[in-house]
Amino acid sequence: MVSRGPDEWLETIKKCQALTENEMKQLCEMVKELLMEESNIQPVQTPVTVCGDIHGQFHDLLELFRTAGGFPDDINYIFLGDYVDRGYYSLETFTLLMCLKVKYPAKITLVRGNHESRQITQVYGFYEECLNKYGSTTVWKYCCQVFDFLTLAAIIDGKILCVHGGLSPEIRMLDQIRVLSRAQEVPHEGGFSDLLWSDPDNVEAWQVSPRGAGWLFGSKVAREFNHVNGLNLIARAHQLVMEGFKYHFPEKDVVTVWSAPNYCYRCGNVASVMKVDEDLEPTFKIFSAVPDDYIRESTANHNNQRAGYFL
């Protein structure tokens, strides 16, 4: 058989067809090498499109690209993590994003979410999906090695911090993120974990999160963090927003971007991407779920019993 390369892999995965185990090994090695060169806070220039959780909703990811204006050959993208779990095409979703990273390394930034974790993916679907599709856990292990090298944050023109979850009482300055050791499984607590797990909420300062990891943080915390670090905005994902995006706090200095429409194929929400031009004024493009026969068939054929953690 003639060996195929990244261009052929991309054309295959665009059709929602999985790569071979050996191709996945090669792809993951290529992506790891690219990610090793990136900093914990990857600088990105405008114009850029920021995308929230995808959660294995492959056909909706294709709709996201259509909504945003195309693949990264023309547009800079930042994805805020949670590529896998819950949806039925986590493997194909993450494979597509990795193929795009290889083809357009400077045009797409992949931030780590709390689901890019060995522990979480063994509970919420990605581990089981890889086992079912390949007959072994080998490809899952390759992908988990990539997870360990995903960047923790991105910063747009030095003014908009992009992170999966939120802030940490252990992190006051951006430089404290830059010196974290990220090439590891997500810790159970501490600054690294908090970046992936925390949520903005109507609390005075800090409050223990009901998720069991990370913190709830209030408007005063966000305002002080942005002031100290010269930021205009924190863009994050991590929480389902029925309207696709949501500004938090009176200052509108934290925004949630959610990019998985009709989440879990049943929530009925719309999704959004956040476009940021040179003026640093965000605008949002809303899109709905694709009424896809593949998804309906998969939904009917899958056991939808998952553990209780939902958002």
Curated annotation (Swiss-Prot):
Cofactor section: Mn(2+)
Keyword Ribosomal protein: no
E.C. numbers: 3.1.3.16
Protein's cellular compartments: Cytoplasm
Remaining remarks: Present with 3970 molecules/cell in log phase SD medium.
Family according to the record: Belongs to the PPP phosphatase family. PP-6 (PP-V) subfamily.
Primary role: Involved in the dephosphorylation of the large subunit of RNA polymerase II. Is required in late G1 for normal G1 cyclin expression, bud initiation and expression of certain genes that are periodically expressed during late G1. Associates with the SAP proteins in a cell cycle-dependent manner.
Record-given protein name: Serine/threonine-protein phosphatase PP1-1
Organism: Saccharomyces cerevisiae (strain ATCC 204508 / S288c) (Baker's yeast)
